[in-house]
Amino acid sequence: MDGYEIEKIDEGLWAIDDKMGCSMYLVEGKNKALLVDTGVQEGKILPMLKSLTDKPISLALTHAHIDHMYHADEFEEVYLHERDIKAWHGGVGLCMSLAQLCFTSSIRSTGSRSIFPLLTRLSLISVASR
C-alpha cells in the first residue's frame, strides 16, 4: 500500500514499515484494534489501516518522539505513558513547532500501570525509564 511494507505475522497481527524506515504494529482484538506507533510517512495512515481491519482502531504510543506519533491526530483514542505526557507538555526532546502541527488530539495516560489490557488477545506492557 503506497509506500508501506505490510507483513501479516499471524491472524490479527501485522508488522508495518513506512518508507521512512519507521516500524509499527497493528493488533486486532475481538471488538477493536490497536496500532502501536505511527511512523512519519506523509499522507494519512488510517485508510491503509482500515484496509486491514474493520474494527475501531486506538493508538498506543511507545514514547513522545515525532517519528512514533506523527499521525496521532487521526485517532480518537491515543494512549501514552504518564511520564511521556509530562515530557510532551514540557517539550523535553521534541521539536515543538512540528509536533504541535501534527498532534492536536487529546492523549490519555496509561497511568502507572505496568500492564495495559486494551485488547482481549494481548496485554500491552507499559514501560517507562526511570
Stretch-by-stretch model annotation:
Residues 4-5, 23-25, 114-116, 120-122, ...:
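Residue-level detector of beta-strand structural context in well-folded domains
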Residues 41-125:
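Active-site HxH/HxHxD metal-binding segment of metal-dependent hydrolases
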Residues 32-34, 58, 129:
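Structural motif
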Residues 2-50:
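Conserved beta-strand hairpin/beta-sheet module of binuclear metal-dependent hydrolase folds
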Residues 1-4, 101-102, 126-130:
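Short charge-dense sequence patches
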